[in-house]
């Protein structure tokens, strides 16, 4: 549960904005979507390796 203390005289829109920002930072929605279906650890690891290789090729192309 997220708790956002509201300061005296604070606008409700600003408090909602702080709540939404804190909610996004916690990654709750991202975590729920990831848990909808089981993904094998080997598949997760393979995806991470492919992503790292892609980022490395982008960095290499920028350097040359």
Swiss-Prot record:
Top-level taxon of the source organism: Bacteria
Gene3D superfamilies recorded: Ribosomal protein S8
InterPro entries, alphabetized: Ribosomal_bS21 (IPR001911), Ribosomal_bS21_sf (IPR038380)
Keywords: Ribonucleoprotein, Ribosomal protein
Gene Ontology cellular-component terms listed: ribonucleoprotein complex; ribosome
GO biological process, one term: translation
Keyword Ribosomal protein: yes
Single GO molecular function: structural constituent of ribosome
Keyword hit for Zinc: no
Pfam families per the UniProt record, alphabetical: Ribosomal_S21 (PF01165)
Family of the protein in this entry: Belongs to the bacterial ribosomal protein bS21 family.
UniProt cross-references to NCBIfam families, sorted A to Z: S21p
Protein name: Small ribosomal subunit protein bS21
């Amino acid at each position: 549960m997220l708790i956002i203390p509201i300061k005296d005289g604070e606008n409700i829109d600003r408090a909602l904005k702080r709540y939404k920002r804190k909610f996004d930072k916690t990654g709750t929605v991202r975590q729920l979507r990831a848990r909808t279906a089981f993904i094998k650890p080997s598949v997760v690891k393979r995806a991470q390796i492919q992503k790292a290789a892609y980022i490395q090729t982008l960095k290499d192309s920028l350097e040359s």
